[in-house]
């Protein structure tokens, strides 16, 4: 719905004028002054007025420090008067008398803090060493405090809302401390060093506060590190000196072990092992140690002598000893002389020689093998036949073939 007159400039000008006239009309109405009649028995100001049922009017209350001297009527309001000495009224009232001031009773354990006036009663408190006993949130009398001393690290806890003298000591909460012995001791929070721009020197406990100190300067920390390094070096040097004085041989052995094989260098070659005295060398040089060998005559090789046969039978043992020798031993060969050289447990052959391996029963010859030598001109003794310990020239018996015993051949292989 449109209001052309209200939206027009003339309507906007009339608005403030109408509001001012309404305020004047309200102010011009007569204000209700007690005593005044009212229909619902409810006065306008409940704190400072009261309803008088005898006259069916609302009357004024007396202010603090006064009492009702004359009751109101339909034509007259309440008449108030100041309370006499040693009496008081603390609130707005319609009482006909004032309350009597009550002094602080020493017998009950009280002492006076502020005297009684017409608008306030005397203010009392318990004497030192005593505490209040409350009843309906009012201290009725005082009693001596119980001698319950809370030790450091604990605090007093009120367990009874009526009697605050019933205390119990409980441990302080984490982050709090208490360092006195008192029945009213309370735990306090630990000091926070970082808030004060300090560093913590010692942490707080339940019975002590946190200890703070100024932050150390960088120069002091550097000096401390240098001194600590020097102390450790001197301590290490002292320990080494004591160990050298008490155990010099052990220290020398340790130094020898450290210097024997430096890192990155090869260990020196080990000396050649000595020949075992219990197993003497069985190989003897077959050719002279010096001088060149004379060229062998052309033609088939001659029959091996008895020493050559014995040497060939002993060759497996010599070969086994050569396998056990160190690699360095094989390199120790005398150069510039032809022949067979024996060094330790090794046999070195220089020059052209023929080796007779002896007859092998049932064996086959290869294409590169030398021609078979003729059979020896002497027979081999029969198996089990007794003979002298020294070598002698055997004789062939009639009707027997030239051969070597099979057991002798197998015996050489077993060696």
UniProtKB/Swiss-Prot annotation:
Q: Where in the cell is it found?
A: Membrane
Spell out which residues lie on the membrane's Extracellular side: 31-223
Q: Which example biological process does GO assign this protein?
A: positive regulation of canonical NF-kappaB signal transduction
Query: Which residues in this protein are found as Phosphoserine?
Result: 315
Keywords (A to Z) from UniProt: Apoptosis, Disulfide bond, Glycoprotein, Membrane, Phosphoprotein, Receptor, Repeat, Signal, Transmembrane, Transmembrane helix
Q: What this chain does, per the record?
A: Receptor for the heterotrimeric lymphotoxin containing LTA and LTB, and for TNFS14/LIGHT. Activates NF-kappa-B signaling upon stimulation with lymphotoxin. Promotes apoptosis via TRAF3 and TRAF5. May play a role in the development of lymphoid organs.
Q: What else is known?
A: Aedes aegypti lymphotoxin beta receptor inhibitor reduces dimerization and trimerization of LTBR induced by lymphotoxin (LTA(3)).
UniProt-recorded name of the protein: Tumor necrosis factor receptor superfamily member 3
Q: Which gene encodes it?
A: Ltbr
């Amino acid at each position: 719905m449109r209001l052309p007159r209200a939206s027009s400039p003339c309507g906007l000008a009339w608005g403030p004028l109408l509001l001012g006239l309404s305020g004047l009309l309200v102010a011009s109405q007569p204000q209700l002054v007690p005593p005044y009649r009212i229909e619902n028995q409810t006065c306008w100001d409940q704190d400072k007025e009261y309803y008088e049922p005898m006259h069916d009017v609302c009357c004024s209350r007396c202010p603090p420090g006064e009492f009702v001297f004359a009751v109101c009527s339909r034509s007259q309001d309440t008449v108030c008067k100041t309370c006499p000495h040693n009496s008081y009224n603390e609130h707005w009232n319609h009482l006909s008398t004032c309350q009597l001031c009550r002094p602080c009773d020493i017998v009950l354990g009280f002492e006076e803090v502020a005297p009684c006036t017409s608008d306030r009663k005397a203010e009392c408190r318990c004497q030192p060493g005593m505490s209040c006993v409350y009843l309906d949130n009012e201290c009725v009398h005082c009693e001596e405090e119980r001698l319950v001393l809370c030790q450091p690290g604990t605090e007093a806890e009120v367990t009874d809302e009526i009697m605050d003298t019933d205390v119990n000591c409980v441990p302080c909460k984490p982050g709090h401390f208490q360092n006195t012995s008192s029945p009213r001791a309370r735990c306090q929070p630990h000091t926070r060093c970082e808030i004060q721009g300090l560093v913590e020197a010692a942490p707080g406990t339940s019975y002590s506060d946190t200890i703070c100190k100024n932050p150390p300067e960088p120069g002091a920390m550097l000096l401390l590190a240098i001194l600590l390094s020097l102390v450790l070096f001197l301590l290490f040097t002292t320990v080494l000196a004591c160990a050298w004085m008490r155990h010099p041989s052990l220290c020398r052995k340790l130094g020898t072990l450290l210097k024997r094989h430096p890192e990155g260098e090869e260990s020196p070659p080990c000396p050649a092992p000595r020949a075992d005295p219990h197993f003497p060398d069985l190989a003897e040089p077959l050719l002279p140690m010096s001088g060149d060998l004379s060229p062998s005559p052309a033609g088939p090789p001659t029959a091996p002598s008895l020493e050559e046969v014995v040497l060939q039978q002993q060759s497996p043992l010599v070969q086994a000893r050569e396998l056990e020798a160190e690699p360095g031993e094989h390199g120790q060969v005398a150069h510039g002389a032809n022949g067979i050289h024996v060094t330790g447990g090794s046999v070195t052959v220089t020059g052209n020689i023929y080796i007779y391996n002896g007859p092998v029963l049932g064996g086959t010859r290869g294409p590169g093998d030398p021609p078979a030598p003729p059979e020896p001109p002497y027979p081999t003794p029969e198996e089990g036949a007794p003979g002298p310990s020294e070598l002698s020239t055997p004789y062939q018996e009639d009707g027997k073939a030239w051969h070597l015993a099979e057991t002798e051949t197998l015996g050489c292989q077993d060696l």
